[in-house]
Amino acid sequence: MAARKNKKEGSQMGTVEKSSNNDASVTDDIRGAEYYHGMVPRQDAEANLKREGDFLVRKTEQTPGKVVLALSVRVTDELCRHFMLNLDPTSNKFYFEATHQESTIPDLITWHMTTKTPVSAASGAKLRRPMERSPWLINHDSIVANKKLGEGAFGDVFVAELDQGGGKQEVAVKTMRAEATRDARLKFMKEARLMRKYQHKHVVKVIGVAIHEHPLMIVMEFCPNGSLLSHLKKNKVAAGEKLRFTTEAADGIAYLERSKCIHRDIAARNCLLSQKNELKISDFGMSDSTDEIKEEKLDKVPLKWLAPETMQDKIYTHKTDIWTFGVLVWEIYADGSEPYPGLTKVQTRAKIVVNDYRMKMPDGTPSQIADIVTGTCWQKNPEKRTTMDAIHKKIREFYDSKK
């Protein structure tokens, strides 16, 4: 992804010729088909198929490391069926049931559509309407990576150029490598699916996903001024700007609360700054659209940002996001310092859970903001934390009074 491939290379990107192991493989004729959706998960495929006879073709991991093509069909209002595309190693032709074979997958699909022959006699599934790819699904050839911003266990983040024919746009691209586990890929797609729903000026916007081949990519708006944490550490941030960051974060998190999103990882490191230095909530890798999340363990989570009930009972709710927002505000006024300075994670947990300890807000924090954090966000009883809407309203009123 480091540079745009030439035409010859581009036409071969992700192409695999017909294999000899009875699997239908991705070839250029199917990659160009309107109904080919790449590595869209089964859940997303079923959500896209609305009416009886709607269908699409997608890639799926049949067994670890073995990727095949599948046909997904809406059979009834309640039921979708999924069929493997098979390749006869003797005839080198494709089929669903061996009684009829075609030289190409598009020819096989067309035959079933025109003859109205069910994909299988047992299912009775007929192909009526091909489900076209959403504009949200972006071709890999439209993306040119420029600079790596960071890397993770299964992928990297790049600044890239997106060109879909309407002009070039600078974007951020989060990738998922081919060697990632199936669970990691499903979480990756879940993150993209969640972010796609959110449209707010203080939440990072997802433009689309590239999932026709590896690496899988989430394409997002680019925030050139980097993370809030880095900005706080590197610059002497004025009091007015700190208050604005606090207000913008509250606005974005209140929107997520209204959207039933539990973020679970609100922190200065996960807030990005736009060209105009506006704060945007990012990183939805731990998020979910629900009212409560119960975890089995808290091994790899940032403990110093957790609410007491999360530390004790491994529960996340919209109220735990409010607690974490309070820690974010502390970070803003502490110039990006780590919360609970001088304490280990174990000591932090003990002081909060056993001793009901609360940090003192940093010097320079307006008393109105300090009162909201210590008196509302950090209430031991989650119900006394009110709502992010109510908290944002109070902060906004104070911010407006200072203009």
Enumerate the predicted regions with their spans.
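Catalytic-loop of the protein kinase fold
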Residues: E257-L273
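A short, aromatic-enriched beta-strand patch in the conserved N-lobe beta-sheet
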Residues: G208-V209
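Domain-scale recognition of modular recruitment/scaffold domains used in eukaryotic signaling
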Residues: A2-F154, A178
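Regulatory alphaC helix of protein kinase catalytic domains
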Residues: F188-R193
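Glycine-rich ATP phosphate-binding loop
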Residues: D156-A178
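Conserved short submotifs of the Hanks-type protein kinase catalytic core
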Residues: E213-S227, H231
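Activation segment signature within eukaryotic-like protein kinase domains
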Residues: F245-T246
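Conserved catalytic-loop aspartate of Hanks-type protein kinases
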Residues: D321
